[in-house]
């Protein structure tokens, strides 16, 4: 799937309705899906970040990953359009499957 334009609000709300752990966040340069995953230690958080990286590489579509002690935050959006694309919804759902 090639990013072309952002999804409408209806699709975003439907996704959040079925994936309530995810949030839609808005920054000046982007609208994105965000979720923070919690772990008991840094090693688990880092391992999870690496697994998300594997998904990203397979799709050639890369999120922002923020790694802290016991937490990994994943933000999906299409940089080219500065918004959420259908591929971001799929990859966010794929990210959930890692847990």
Language-model regions, residue ranges each:
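Short, well-ordered beta-strand elements within core beta-sheets of diverse protein domains
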Residues: 32-40
């Amino acid at each position: 799937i090639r990013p072309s334009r952002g999804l409408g609000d209806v699709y975003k709300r439907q996704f959040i309705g079925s994936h309530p752990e995810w949030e839609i966040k808005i920054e000046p340069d982007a609208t994105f899906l965000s979720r923070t995953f919690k772990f008991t230690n840094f090693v688990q958080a880092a391992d999870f970040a690496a697994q998300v990286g594997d998904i990203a590489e397979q799709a050639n579509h890369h999120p922002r990953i923020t790694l802290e002690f016991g937490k990994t935050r994943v933000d999906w959006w299409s940089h080219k359009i500065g918004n959420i694309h259908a591929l971001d919804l799929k990859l966010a759902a794929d990210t959930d499957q890692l847990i």
